[in-house]
């Protein structure tokens, strides 16, 4: 596999930005592309530093693109940058043009952990027709729950005001359950893999989200096992997620 630090200009962000990329080496062409999203304290290279994602991608002849979004919660910020537009509209197009990877709906996947799990779910629930599958690990599934935890933290309140606005209103486009409620049962249903450790502080949110997804989508696999909110769990979960959502004919022996 080839590992690339990709620096490029983003028109939507109006600046240069970064992504870490894992690609099958020449002459192999990737069969699918995964946009893999970092958590709140992470960066574009964190998945590669903390897991064996390169080895897992090689088993599936998979291209993995890990973008940088700061602490934006994968949102078009009220007082900040349009990171959701960047992830959903711009990044796939730039990846196809520059890296020559497949980004059509049959071959594009998105996944992430914690804040990135929220971002991955938000991508697919906003645009279910654009993705073949979603991997959500230890996701924060309720922004409202997060806001309750920061009521006495001025620093985080300011951070969230930049994201949501001064009144901290969670609009439907940032509410996973509101997005899910809008969806009519799609003809081509994306596949979902949801996992969380049973000792994770976000455990109940993953359980509830998986149950809600199963009411709308045909292919939703939920797994749990003993674990907390850490890389031990996520390194074990990401290869299981790939096996769950990728087409069977393209999985490793």
Could you tell me what each predicted segment is?
Residues 1-253:
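Non-catalytic cap/lid and distal C-terminal segments of serine-dependent acyl enzymes
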